[in-house]
């Protein structure tokens, strides 16, 4: 007990020494630095677009397995970077690439939300060998993103255009599907006719009467080919219109 008493006495002396030190009184921002409030709650009458500027989207889910190419790309990016989440009080560290990505379009990502922003970014990524921005974009996802952005950042006339673009997209998608099915049907018919002609050309005993009994004539074949070319032209026109719609929506998202 004597040994323990000596330690307790030493602790008591140290506490008295600490209490006797001159500490300055709490200042104006002491509580703000120690607590974790939303910064926009400290400012009165904030707008939705102002609150979006001071919020950071949640980080995307981390991949459990990385390919050898991804690991090779991550090797040079080993410099420590720190990202502060103002609303959630989160401090994350990562490589140079992750920090620059987190800072890019932060306000837009915060408004869209993590899932919707990830879906849009997946659609805008080009596949290997494609031009940048030529990925498969889900138009419905883009329109939902436009609606959420316009609710925070009002753009005159943008919300009125969304249902028009959605209706036009659905109509042209249905028309494109119809013409694609029609082209496939005509192509199958042409292949079947070509195969029958090859079989007939290989048979030297076919008489002219048998040839006349064939249901498709040369004129019918030319007519079918012309119809296929016309359908293919309409399909290309529809695809050009759909690309124009994608460009319009991309312009709305970039505003």
Swiss-Prot record:
Keywords: Cell cycle, Cell division, Centromere, Chromosome, Chromosome partition, Coiled coil, Cytoplasm, Cytoskeleton, Kinetochore, Microtubule, Mitosis, Nucleus
InterPro entries: Spc34
Single biological process term from Gene Ontology: attachment of mitotic spindle microtubules to kinetochore
Main location: nucleus
Biased composition (Polar residues): 63-81
Coiled coil: 176-248
GO cellular component terms, A-Z: cytoplasm; DASH complex; kinetochore; mitotic spindle; spindle microtubule
Pfam families linked to this entry: DASH_Spc34
Family: Belongs to the DASH complex SPC34 family.
Function recorded in the entry: Component of the DASH complex that connects microtubules with kinetochores and couples microtubule depolymerisation to chromosome movement; it is involved in retrieving kinetochores to the spindle poles before their re-orientation on the spindle in early mitosis and allows microtubule depolymerization to pull chromosomes apart and resist detachment during anaphase.
UniProt-recorded name of the protein: DASH complex subunit SPC34
